[in-house]
Amino acid sequence: MHRFVLALVVFAGAAIVWAADDAAHEEGVEWTGKPWMGKWESDPSKDENVEEFKKKLQLPMSHSEMNKNSKVWIHHYKKGDEYHHKIIINDAHYKNDIVFKLGQESAGSYNGSSFSVKYEDKDGALVGSVHYTGTKEQSLDKTINNVFKLEGDHLVKTSTIEGVTMKRHYNKRQ
């Protein structure tokens, strides 16, 4: 009985943490309005050229803990006039919420690495770039061009850096 109660407490605690981190419970959050908005879960079996892309990226943020079967969750939502691009990779212990306004450059950072993003909505796709400038110790000048586009009922992210392109396919989460 003691193990059951302990397991129940751990499960309930994890559920509370997950719910508290979920923007769906925040007032004023919009999950619809653009085809690419919503909660998305990657399907690693459909990924294309991810390992080659990670090699070209050569950043601390390239998530060395990830393997080819690691799932990536993306939450695209709007709060006020700001959009959020939240990335969650549990295998890599990575979580980042990138906040931006369409058509404007926004600064961001993670784990000491600085970057800027600029996204636009073009014909129902989220199109833009992420420019990495590096850390205090290591200056970088790398730009990733991203397109998030709905294909049928799946979101496809196409990313290109220095001539190397990867595709990641996402299924809509409820």
Swiss-Prot record:
Q: Which UniProt keywords apply?
A: Glycoprotein, Secreted, Signal, Stress response
Matching InterPro entries, A to Z? Calycin (IPR012674)
Which residues are noted as glycosylation sites? N111
One cellular-component annotation, GO: extracellular region
Protein's cellular compartments: Secreted
Q: Signal sequence span per UniProt?
A: 1-19
Region of interest (SAHS-c2), ranges: 77-105
Give me the ranges of the annotated region SAHS-c1.
Answer: 30-60
Which superkingdom does the taxonomy of this entry point to?
Answer: Eukaryota
Q: Where is this region: SAHS-c3?
A: 118-172
Q: What is known of its domains?
A: SAHS-c1, SAHS-c2 and SAHS-c3 are 3 highly conserved regions within the SAHS protein family.
Misc. remarks from the entry: Trehalose, a disaccharide essential for several organisms to survive drying, is detected at low levels or not at all in some tardigrade species, indicating that tardigrades possess potentially novel mechanisms for surviving desiccation involving tardigrade-specific intrinsically disordered proteins (TDPs).
Q: What protein family is recorded?
A: Belongs to the Secretory-abundant heat soluble protein (SAHS) family.
What does this protein do, in the record's words? Secreted heat soluble protein acting as a molecular shield in water-deficient condition. Tardigrade-specific intrinsically disordered proteins (TDPs) are essential for desiccation tolerance by forming non-crystalline amorphous solids upon desiccation, and this vitrified state mirrors their protective capabilities.
Record-given protein name = Secretory-abundant heat soluble protein 2
Q: Which organism is it from?
A: Ramazzottius varieornatus (Water bear)
Q: Which gene encodes it?
A: SAHS2
